């Protein structure tokens, strides 16, 4: 018995980006033919799993992506899409306490530059939109992180807020859902998504990372 939830979208890289959410339930039944009850009580293999040394590791992640942007339309409560595609670059440095083989948690320093941040509709500009200077499009934030660790894959969530920013779009409470795919023992690919206020789509986080001071025992 189980349940599955899925969200499909284009990651705010194109318009429209309405998204699709699905939820389903699963029920399964298994019957084993000709299995003897005494075989279940026997252990045929005795894997040696060393004790886990609890420790603090440090994840450094660099990411980038592209996005579309909708800005407030003057004189109405609606929004209009800005022309073009805008770049996003960022980093994350996260000291993580490793509790065991399956879970780690910690805090992260998050930095981002979003070329679409704080754009405004402006009839004085040639394309009809005003883009502020770079200092209004950068931010530093702090987030709490938790990660479920599996062989080759790690699924993580983060909740944070920007503490140094240029105001406007960058003054936000953000959420992160990320997948890390091991490439080597300490390096990984990073695929994530950033939300604002739990419902506003923000940007993809496609990047690479490296884990320092990794004392996790090698099992495979």
PLM region spans:
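Outer-membrane beta-barrel translocator/channel fold
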Residues: 2-4, 11-16, 117, 190-220
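Solvent-exposed loop/turn segments connecting transmembrane beta-strands
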Residues: 12-15, 19-20, 83-85, 99-101, ...
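Repeated loop/turn-to-beta-strand initiation elements of outer-membrane beta-barrel proteins
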Residues: 1, 35-38, 102-105, 150-156, ...
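Residues on the lipid-exposed face of transmembrane beta-strands in outer-membrane beta-barrel proteins
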Residues: 1-3, 25-31, 91-97, 109-111, ...
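Outer-membrane beta-barrel "beta-signal"
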Residues: 21-42, 201-220
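Flexible, solvent-exposed loop segments that connect beta-strands
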Residues: 72-82, 116-134
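Transmembrane beta-barrel strands of outer-membrane/channel proteins
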Residues: 1-7, 56-68, 107-113, 144-148, ...
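Residues that define the transmembrane beta-barrel architecture of outer-membrane proteins
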Residues: 19-25, 29, 54-56, 85-91, ...
